[in-house]
From Swiss-Prot:
Membership in a protein family: Belongs to the amidase family. GatA subfamily.
Keywords: ATP-binding, Ligase, Nucleotide-binding, Protein biosynthesis
HAMAP family, per database record: GatA
Record InterPro entries: Amidase, Amidase_dom, AS_sf, GatA
Organism: Bdellovibrio bacteriovorus (strain ATCC 15356 / DSM 50701 / NCIMB 9529 / HD100)
EC number(s) recorded for this UniProt protein: 6.3.5.7
Catalytic activity: L-glutamyl-tRNA(Gln) + L-glutamine + ATP + H2O = L-glutaminyl-tRNA(Gln) + L-glutamate + ADP + phosphate + H(+)
PANTHER family: GLUTAMYL-TRNA(GLN) AMIDOTRANSFERASE SUBUNIT A (PTHR11895:SF151), TRANSAMIDASE (PTHR11895)
Record-linked SUPFAM superfamilies: Amidase signature (AS) enzymes (SSF75304)
The protein, known as: Glutamyl-tRNA(Gln) amidotransferase subunit A
Subunit composition and interactions: Heterotrimer of A, B and C subunits.
Any single Gene Ontology cellular-component annotation: glutamyl-tRNA(Gln) amidotransferase complex
Active site, UniProt feature: K78 (charge relay system), S153 (charge relay system), S177 (acyl-ester intermediate)
Length: 490
């Protein structure tokens, strides 16, 4: 077994039957992190207890205990998740030394299944970004081309997974933050139905949109990880009590008779020719496998980006008001003169510690929620959001799964769009509507640009229909033009 490219279940099975120890696996990936992370900047910190955690897994197996589905599997965790005893910064200076006293539910469930936490992964500050250029920890580089972005906000997770610094990673998706970097880095990323995975212990950006999901190397690995982290959590009132299906066991590449919807609004002239060709190839593949392709229309997605930025910024302006330097996190220093009043203390702390993009969105959100504009902006955005969801529900009466591009183009160069917020926001043009409607969505690698950059296909399903989506992805994965290809940095 080649540990570097082994699947989650292969590693777990080998650890469980003691053909390799969890400690050996951990040391193997720690060496990879040591060698490659300086080039990528994917990890912000390492878990000093990783080897001891692996030894504990080995000891439990030696005692005949059932360690779990992911015994000894090394995982990287996005900075957005609280991890007991490990710094959790959300990519921001304002939380630079924050160490949570507890684990996020998703992390706790992964630990219960036997994983070894290798460390924390870089991200855009408070998940606000599409390129991983807003992080307090610096820019993450795409392992396929070190001059390009890995996508965002879960860029560290995508880069670490694509370069196999770990066997699996965890990300969050508020408007495409799992799917877009997954596409840019050629991995599988899944955003489940809103409420499928607990948000407890995830640093809040936009509470009605945030969702956690796996960023891994295969559809089966994604299904397996999703099984572990999903399910009702009394700590999060938005989680569903629906039973968690055995997605990984029910995976099948048989799409014969399935109706695949092709989103009319997304097949525009704005698509890069390589992306257009990849979508067309995926459609042809599914036709050959027996699926029926039908055109579907969700006209209100034309307003998805402005609606998303109104809703997300408004919720962020409320959520981020808790960071004031009083109880935890960064606090402004007043060496020569103390703060005149509490307001100055707050403004100095936040002014010094929040990045430019976070400040921009807080200002936008505060403006949208102000008394004179609440109805015109926030309320109106909520009404359009409802229409988007209703139109999606109508579309799913005609098809099982909707297929579309993830982004208009492959990964762009570092610095290319950072000074143009509008161009950066339009990266989310195909992904935000899924979050607004609370639907499950994913990116599966399928093609490459002429310059060798990976291109993913986005699949979206009805609420709690992850199995259909995963099955179509499994079929596409089997016929993928990039299967078995890896970044040169490896």
């Amino acid at each position: 077994m080649d540990l570097t490219f082994a699947s989650l279940s292969e590693i777990s099975e080998a650890v469980n039957n003691r053909s390799i120890s969890a400690k050996e696996v951990t040391l193997h990936f720690l060496k990879r992190i040591e060698n490659l992370n300086p080039k990528l900047n994917a990890f912000t910190s390492l878990n000093p207890q990783a080897v001891q955690e692996a030894e504990a897994v080995d000891a439990r197996i030696a005692n005949g205990e059932d360690v779990g589905l992911l015994a000894g599997v090394p995982f990287g965790i996005k900075e957005m998740f609280c991890t007991k005893g490990l710094t959790t910064t959300a990519g921001s200076k304002i939380l630079e030394n924050f160490v949570p006293p507890y684990d996020a539910t998703a992390v706790a469930r992964l630990k219960k299944s036997g994983i070894v936490v290798m460390g924390k992964l870089n991200q855009d500050e408070f998940a606000m970004g599409s390129s991983n250029e807003t992080s307090f920890h610096g820019v993450v580089k795409n392992p396929w081309d070190l001059e390009r972005v890995p996508g965002g906000s879960s860029g560290g997770s995508a880069a670490a997974q694509a370069s196999r610094l770990v066997a699996g990673t965890l990300g969050t998706d508020t408007g495409g933050s799992i799917r877009q970097p997954a596409s840019f880095c050629g991995i599988v990323g899944v955003k489940p139905t809103y409420g499928r995975v607990s948000r407890y212990g995830i640093v809040a950006y936009a509470s009605s949109l945030d969702q956690a999901g796996p960023m891994v190397s295969s559809v089966r690995d994604a299904a397996l990880t999703l099984e572990v982290i999903s399910g009702f959590d009394p700590q999060d009132s938005t989680t569903t009590q629906k039973q968690v299906p055995a997605w990984s066991q029910n995976l099948k590449a048989d799409v014969k008779g399935m109706k695949i919807g092709l989103m009319k609004e997304y097949m525009t002239g704005a698509l890069d020719p390589d992306v257009q060709k990849t979508v067309e190839n995926s459609v042809d593949t599914l036709k050959q496998l027996g699926a029926e392709i039908v055109e579907v229309s969700v006209p209100m997605t034309a307003f998805a980006v402005p609606v998303y930025y109104l809703v997300a910024a408004s919720e962020a302006s409320s959520n981020l008001s808790r960071y004031d330097g009083v109880k935890y996190g960064y606090r402004a220093e007043f060496k020569n003169l103390s703060a005149v009043d509490l307001e100055e203390f707050y403004s100095q702390t936040r002014g010094q510690a929040f990045g430019a993009e976070v400040k921009r969105r807080i200002m936008l959100g505060t403006y949208c929620l102000s008394s004179g504009y609440y109805d015109a902006f926030y309320n109106k955005a909520g009404q359009v959001r409802r229409l988007i969801m209703e139109q999606y529900l109508e579309a799913f009466k005609k098809c099982d799964v909707i297929l579309s591009p993830v982004t208009t183009a492959p990964a762009f160069k570092i610095g290319e769009r950072v000074s143009d917020p509008l161009a950066m926001y339009l990266n989310d043009i195909f992904t935000t509507s899924t979050n607004l409607a609370g639907l499950p969505g994913m990116s599966v690698p399928f093609g490459q640009s002429q310059s060798g950059l990976p291109i993913g296909i986005q699949l979206t399903a009805g609420h709690f229909e992850e199995q259909k989506m995963l099955n179509v992805a499994f079929a596409l994965e089997g016929a993928s033009l990039v299967k078995g290809k890896h970044p040169h940095v490896i």
